[in-house]
């Protein structure tokens, strides 16, 4: 899975490429072929190297191609029903769903942060997929979507976002209105403090597990929860950044889920490192 040549083809002339705006297509095609291959290979490696050439153009397309292949591996329905909590301004899952279902997917997300929501909307206005952005907290998704109403829930770099929100709100940060990127360092530092002190068991873990529990209830039997995470090597030597914690977020979530007795079974896929990926199938 995620063969370099296959990913390059999907991004530069295949199903992902076809769903991009003309501007993004032009930016992509302007990259020399040798640099393109080297950069995509670097982005397929987790943790990714620092300062990957053309990373700003390629990163989300690589993630979209990876999710597209996961959808194929699980033989998900052509008219895919997707829920993504904590989407922020990130569009890889939406692009992957658009490509997989040829514009016939149904995608729902919950996004309280207004700045990130506006940034996301600016990226996806050209897509044909039915897209619903709910202005609410991810913990309240069951008031908007019914049981067994989706085929897959995608936690794309979402574990940290859910926990960061949970630890920041009690400290007085309004995560719905704050400018996310300039304040994310503070959120991450608070998260690290709470893991180190053990407070995370009372504030952080419960909120994430509620979101995951809701995702299980939303997903039809036989459907999937997909988790991925990464942390770029550029942050490894940054003094304030909790490198080891960020690298362990998927294993930490896996342990919490195992302790929860939720009706899920972990599925392994080739080439998907369990340090950075987790696939859970809803039991019948």
Task: Give the location of each predicted region.
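Class I SAM-dependent methyltransferase Rossmann-like catalytic core
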Residues: 9-77
């Amino acid at each position: 899975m995620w063969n370099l040549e296959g990913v390059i083809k999907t991004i530069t002339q295949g199903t992902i490429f076809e769903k991009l705006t003309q501007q993004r297509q032009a930016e992509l095609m302007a990259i020399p072929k040798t640099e393109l291959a080297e950069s995509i290979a670097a982005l397929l490696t987790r943790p990714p190297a620092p300062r990957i050439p053309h990373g700003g153009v390629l990163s989300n397309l690589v993630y979209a191609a990876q999710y597209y292949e996961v959808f194929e591996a699980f033989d998900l329905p052509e008219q895919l029903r997707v829920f993504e909590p904590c989407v922020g301004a990130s569009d890889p899952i939406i692009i992957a769903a658009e490509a997989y279902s040829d514009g016939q997917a149904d995608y729902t997300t919950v996004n309280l942060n207004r700045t990130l929501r506006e940034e996301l909307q600016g990226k996806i206005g050209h897509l044909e997929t039915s897209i619903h952005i709910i202005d609410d907290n991810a913990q309240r998704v069951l008031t908007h979507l019914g049981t067994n109403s989706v085929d897959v829930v995608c936690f794309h770099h979402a574990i940290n976002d859910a926990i960061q929100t949970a630890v920041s709100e009690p400290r007085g940060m309004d995560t719905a209105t704050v400018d996310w990127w300039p304040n994310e360092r503070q959120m991450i530092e608070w998260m690290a403090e709470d893991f180190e002190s053990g407070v995370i068991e009372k504030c952080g873990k419960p909120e994430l597990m509620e979101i995951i529990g809701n995702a299980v209830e939303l997903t039809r039997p036989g459907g999937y929860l997909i988790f991925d995470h990464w942390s770029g090597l550029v942050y490894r030597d940054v003094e304030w950044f909790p490198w080891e914690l960020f690298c362990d977020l998927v294993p930490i979530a896996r342990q919490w889920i195992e302790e929860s007795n939720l009706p899920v079974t972990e599925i392994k896929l080739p080439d998907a490192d369990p340090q950075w990926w987790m696939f859970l199938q809803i039991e019948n």
